[in-house]
């Protein structure tokens, strides 16, 4: 067994002792100088069901969600306590926590206020925030977010008002044209939120419930069962009035904006899509049915448009909102090597433990020959039971080698002090392997002892290093590293939070390697 301090590691990083021939330089610093940017990620290993980067390393992600659900549809750049922002201070904070991914909401409502005309100003702002994330080592998952689809339903997601009718100074000036949700789609008595309430909400000239406070009288998650919401989702999936085509065209626009962006790890097609018009077809409520019956068609429609401008970026797809069982027959366009199953865990609607859910998702990955990532889970302050559930989720994702993205960034902070809640920060600041130069067999982090363990099978053809994220807040006094077999890995510290481990050039065949990192 080999015990080496991080100080000694900086020296050993450039030395590789061979059985014969003395010492040969293995220039870790030179490798990082030759590869100064973030590694491009655009492939899934269909045998291991894990995401891999351009160097062949298996990649893991810990991160958070950043989504703006109302105008102006993006988080402000300026940092202020109690304000949900996403600027330089925020990405610095996320980097310091040890995170390496952000699921960044790209509102369709904000991006296409007039049908067929895109708000380039908003898209440029989103690209600026994506670039800012790259400067601090954060990947971005481009996410088209929705909750209950539209503001006409007390939600958000699809475009609502495209323009005002009539000349200025006339009554018609205040009439809005709605290019997605139309008032005549359902009879007046079935308008939102029927049947949650027997009397539909009054609406303003834009078709939004008025006063807005009415929205608080209905459980938003139950709004998916309202007649108007079901009808609208059904029309999207059936491509009524070309709405499915418009959705796909928006994705083509986004892909054309990001095709050359190194830190974009994928395109998340739509957040938590509802099953469709379950009032017209009740079988859609059976877990798994909507996935193959209505969602596969929309995902293929969008994926085809994406691939006209971007052949490489991973396409992330979700199952229906209830997300209990996966019912997909195939991944978008049938290529699991360029697709990722994006799934969530909340209880309810999940009925089983997080461990059972992750095991079921593993079976989905094997069946669909793709990878899966937990892109939302409960990551906010709560009672003892909820906090224990979060701790259990952290252990379970490690045990199943699953990447995760918590919901949501703004929940991390105390709104009064602007300081992170320690109970949440400790989970965000876990040690984990961001990149593994081979096939990972297991990894774990014990928050009580601060000990991280990794076992993997090396791949001597991969010259890039294994990278372990060790947040300074978790290891304030440094750390010690134990490697077996001795001499199999050479250490280097490219930055304050990363331990790089280069496989020794003396190793010509695959071997099993174990790494243990513990605090000083």
Which positions does each model-derived feature cover?
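Fungal secretory targeting signals
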Residues: 1-24
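Short linear motifs in intrinsically disordered/low-complexity regions
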Residues: 17, 22, 28, 510-513
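Generic low-complexity segments that are intrinsically disordered, proline-rich and/or Lys/Arg-biased
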Residues: 20, 27, 37, 160, ...
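N-terminal module-boundary/linker segments of secreted carbohydrate-active enzymes
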Residues: 25-57
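Substrate-binding clefts and catalytic carboxylate motifs of secreted carbohydrate-active enzymes
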Residues: 37, 55-58, 90, 238-256, ...
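Active-site mouth of glycoside hydrolases
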Residues: 47-61, 66-314, 319-327
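Beta-strand-rich extracellular modules
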Residues: 516-518
């Amino acid at each position: 067994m080999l015990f080496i301090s991080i100080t000694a590691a900086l020296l050993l990083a450039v030395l590789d002792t061979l059985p014969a021939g003395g010492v040969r330089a293995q220039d870790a610093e030179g490798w990082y100088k030759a590869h100064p940017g973030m590694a491009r990620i655009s492939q899934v290993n269909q045998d291991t069901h894990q995401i891999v980067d351009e160097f062949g390393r298996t990649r893991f992600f810990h991160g958070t969600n950043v989504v703006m659900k109302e105008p102006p549809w993006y988080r402000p750049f300026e940092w202020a306590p109690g304000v949900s922002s996403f600027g330089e201070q925020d990405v610095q904070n996320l980097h310091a926590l040890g995170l390496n991914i952000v699921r960044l909401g790209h509102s369709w409502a904000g991006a296409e206020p007039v049908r067929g005309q895109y708000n380039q100003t908003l898209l440029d702002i989103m690209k600026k925030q994506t670039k800012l994330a790259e400067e601090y080592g954060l990947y971005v998952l481009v996410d088209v977010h929705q909750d209950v689809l539209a503001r006409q339903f007390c939600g958000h997601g699809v475009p609502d008002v495209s323009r005002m009718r009539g000349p200025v100074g006339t009554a018609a000036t205040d009439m809005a044209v709605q290019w997605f949700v139309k008032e005549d789609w359902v009879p007046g008595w079935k308008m939102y939120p029927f049947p949650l309430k027997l009397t539909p909400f009054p609406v303003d000239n834009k078709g939004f419930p008025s006063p807005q406070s009415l929205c608080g009288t209905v459980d938003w998650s139950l709004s998916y069962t309202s007649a108007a919401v079901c009808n609208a989702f059904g029309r999207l999936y059936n491509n009524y009035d070309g709405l499915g085509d418009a959705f796909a065209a928006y994705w083509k626009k986004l892909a054309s904006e990001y095709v050359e962006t190194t830190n974009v790890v994928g395109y998340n097609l739509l957040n938590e899509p509802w099953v469709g018009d379950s009032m017209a077809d009740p079988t859609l409520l059976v877990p798994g049915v909507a996935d193959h019956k209505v969602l596969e068609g929309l995902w293929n429609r969008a994926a085809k448009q994406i691939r006209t401008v971007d052949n490489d970026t991973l396409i992330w797809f979700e199952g229906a909102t209830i997300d209990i069982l996966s019912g997909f027959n195939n991944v978008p366009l049938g290529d699991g090597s360029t697709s990722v199953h994006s799934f969530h865990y909340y209880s309810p609607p999940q009925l089983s433990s997080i461990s059972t859910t992750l095991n079921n998702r593993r079976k989905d990955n094997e069946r669909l020959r793709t990878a899966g990532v937990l892109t939302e889970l409960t990551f906010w302050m709560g009672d003892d039971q909820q906090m224990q559930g979060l701790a259990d989720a952290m252990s379970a994702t490690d045990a199943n080698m699953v990447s995760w993205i918590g919901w949501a960034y703004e929940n991390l902070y105390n709104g009064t002090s602007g300081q992170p809640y320690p109970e949440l920060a400790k989970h965000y600041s876990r040690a984990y392997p961001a990149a593994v130069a081979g096939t990972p067999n297991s990894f774990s982090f014990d928050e009580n002892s601060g000990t991280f363990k990794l076992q993997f099978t090396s791949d001597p053809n991969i010259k890039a290093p294994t990278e372990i994220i060790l947040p300074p807040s978790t290891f304030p006094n440094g750390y010690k590293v134990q490697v077996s077999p001795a001499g199999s890995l050479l250490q280097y510290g490219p930055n304050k939070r990363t331990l790089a481990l280069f496989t020794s050039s003396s190793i010509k065949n695959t071997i099993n390697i174990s790494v243990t990192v513990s605090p000083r």
